[in-house]
């Protein structure tokens, strides 16, 4: 018996003038997510998804490309003003912020929300290269 064909609903363009940019910069990758003020994802991009593999994902240029891609998609949804939350110690933090600024967004605020332990978990052992 043949299964009924499923119709795929096309994503509708939401009109979101104000949003939040979450930049998560780890040592291995950078993830840029544009959300509305309630936290619902509008667009996202990462250095790995942008075509960079291996150690090139952790470069500032890869973070810049990822931020530009996510910003372009967010602008298609009508986003103009953003607040920026930055998390993590990675090298792509500044480059991603600069790319968001250069994309033509009005930046309302920039906050660093990197979690800092009050002597929590034991860190991984030091690398000997």
Curated annotation (Swiss-Prot):
GO cellular component: ribonucleoprotein complex; ribosome
One of the record's GO molecular function terms: rRNA binding
Protein's UniProt keywords contain Ribonucleoprotein: yes
S-S bonds: none
PROSITE patterns in the cross-refs: RIBOSOMAL_S11
GO biological process, one term: translation
Classification via InterPro entries: Ribosomal_uS11 (IPR001971), Ribosomal_uS11_bac-type (IPR019981), Ribosomal_uS11_CS (IPR018102), Ribosomal_uS11_sf (IPR036967)
Keywords in alphabetical order: Ribonucleoprotein, Ribosomal protein, RNA-binding, rRNA-binding
Pfam families: Ribosomal_S11 (PF00411)
Family, per entry: Belongs to the universal ribosomal protein uS11 family.
PANTHER family xrefs: 40S RIBOSOMAL PROTEIN S14/30S RIBOSOMAL PROTEIN S11 (PTHR11759)
Function description: Located on the platform of the 30S subunit, it bridges several disparate RNA helices of the 16S rRNA. Forms part of the Shine-Dalgarno cleft in the 70S ribosome.
Subunit organization: Part of the 30S ribosomal subunit. Interacts with proteins S7 and S18. Binds to IF-3.
Name recorded for this polypeptide: Small ribosomal subunit protein uS11
Lineage: Bacteria, Pseudomonadati, Thermodesulfobacteriota, Desulfovibrionia, Desulfovibrionales
């Amino acid at each position: 018996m043949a299964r009924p064909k499923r119709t795929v609903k096309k994503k509708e363009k939401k009109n979101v003038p104000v949003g939040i940019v979450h930049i998560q910069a780890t040592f291995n990758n950078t993830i840029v997510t544009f959300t509305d003020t309630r936290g619902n994802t509008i667009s996202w991009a990462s250095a790995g998804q942008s075509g960079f593999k291996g150690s090139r994902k952790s470069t500032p240029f890869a973070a810049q490309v990822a931020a530009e891609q996510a910003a372009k998609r967010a602008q298609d949804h009508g986003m103009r003003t953003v607040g920026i939350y930055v998390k993590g110690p990675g090298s792509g933090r500044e480059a991603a912020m600069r790319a968001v600024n250069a994309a033509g967004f009005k930046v309302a605020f920039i906050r660093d929300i990197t979690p800092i332990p009050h002597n929590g978990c034991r860190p991984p052992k030091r690398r000997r290269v």
